[in-house]
Amino acid sequence: MDGINAKYVSKKISKTRWRPVSSSSLQQPDIFATGSWDNEDNSISIWSIGENGVSSMDDEFEGDPQLLCEYKHNGDVLDLQFLDQDRIVTASSTGAVTIFRHHHNSQTLSVSQLWERAHHYPCNNAPCTGVVCNSPEIVTVGEDGRIMLFRADQEGVLRTIEMADSSAIHAVTFLRTTEILTVNSIGQLKLWDFRQPGNEPSQILSLGGASRTGDRVPLHCVDRHPNQQHIVATGGQDGMLCIWDVRQGNMPISLMEAHTSEMWEVHFHPSNPGHLFSCSEDGSLLHWETSSNTDTPSLQGGRNTSIISRSAIAPAGGNQSLINAWLTGDSSKGHLETTHMLPSQMLSVNSLDVLGQCLVCGTDGEAIYVNRYVPI
């Protein structure tokens, strides 16, 4: 576990996100944000692993994250996304959606915008469970089954999809500029097109009988392949990693045994999507890597991975062998290696983010882990 710095922060960490870096620069990320949950006072915090955060204190180790600033957050931070270099959007268990501004010169945070009851039931608030940003647009989802579209610097709501779901929506991501994907508590993946009027999804895919037990397993997280937008990864209550091709059928293409309990987040590497990362309630963080130069799937870290292939159809475009590894688990065309990224621990790894060679994650063990040398 070389290259990992652990920082104990006395708060359960629910979300971790790197501040984006310019795509034209070759620099590695050095600033990240965290949100906390299940604490007496929750907060959003900004941390540095670069020169900004160098401390002369004797008890600080080189490379340890240094706290730059923090701000009290009303309710649990259920999701967190950078809108741009300066602004961060949070989703709260109170139903609120907040934009915070990070002032780099003074190293302070302030509330830039607040939609207090973005998600609600008739008589009380509903947790806002997910947020995704494509500046200036912000999409949120909640336990109330609503999808909300906001625009930064505009007070009102741009669009509301009422009763988008009769069950709780757990996560959201952009598929394309005008299309989003949501996952819900009954194992469904839904596609929505904001160009279409009305409250109906353009497509519904379902785990259904494809789950390990055949039951409707709640899905907790979703991410799309950065280059092949039709390829989507999800994770849920049963800990399985599901790969979907939204152009084909209405069930996942591949299911892979990943974790022994809930998978909280899954992320393709944004610039090297042959790499994927997942974290779980079981205390593990896995690095999945596709490879096409050997015939046998291998696993590092002492766990068995079984791959259930639903289809062996080769998708159009892209690196066929690497994409086939995601879609089919076909070891003759490509295979998956899985590596444990953290020392064994008992408490949940709630969130992760990866950018360049840097990975950050947050846990219920009140710790933040940073790895600056992820083998990508």
Question: Where would I find each of the regions flagged by the language model?
Answer:
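Short C-terminal beta-strands that terminate individual repeats in beta-propeller domains
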Residues: N5-K7, L68-Y71, L114-P122, R159-A164, ...
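Structural hallmark of WD40 beta-propellers
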Residues: S23-T34, D86-V89, S135-V139, T177-L181, ...
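Short coil/turn segments within WD40 beta-propeller repeats
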Residues: D38-S45, T94-T98, T129, D144-M148, ...
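Blade-level signature of beta-propeller repeat domains, shared across WD40, Kelch, NHL, RCC1
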Residues: N350-I376
